[in-house]
């Protein structure tokens, strides 16, 4: 644990005075290796094989099942890209732990371990991503069985209009559950359970009713208080889910909806080199940029370039990833624990995950690096 007044922390805070987008050239594989090492370090802090996150004042937090789950595919993809098979071990260890803590109803708990929370739809869907990745890697049926049980529970918890409320975070319907739909469709593709595809399609129909003419989505924030100006993290979840579902269903209206929202953010980013952390219904921004949302948008812009062929999406993805590599580079002067990590906000004292290095921000930075490598000329 460190104080924000110690020498290393002061040096890190000084680095965060630089404008976002002040690019320093960093080799992609160097950035990727450092980011992956942070996730492995996060796992090594606890006996349970889950991943927590580092906070500049409070130190390491407890393991987070949801984010551990969707970090697994990132570790396995990095192992392949870096030709570093040792990364397979922490991915499989994490999956084995998640098997042990699956709830009797089939879900996984919300929040961090030790908080005693019930199964939550969104969190459970992200663990399914990890289960499916390890099943594909090992052919161990236990992981597919767990994924199917979880997916069936999610489908059973759905409301008639296609949204999820009672078994979801805050008990309210949210459009970023498109990021739930895709894991359901992936399980369906393997098992053939028709009700999983039906549940995903019902939710997608509901989500499309929440989009305004200018591309902005209502009911998109992970709070009630600020639902009129959602964070880029949940906006990007929504977009990414739409694109992933289109890949699985081949429904052009999903790409159109994703592209409409994405172009609004891209048009703000390309001339300015930065984004705000929140956007209201007129796409007017507020708060410091969220590194998680920025990384996720780099991923979705990469995907949209591949789907549409529109060059600005490629330009935005590359430019954003270069800026994120520079933010990561600043971690070299800070405490050893956070080396290679992506902060919650830039600067570190932004409102979202203040002074913290959430493992999910680093997970999406890894995914962004890999996505951009696929679209470079």
Predicted features along the sequence, with ranges:
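Glycan-recognition and catalytic cores of secretory/periplasmic carbohydrate-active enzymes
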Residues: 1-377
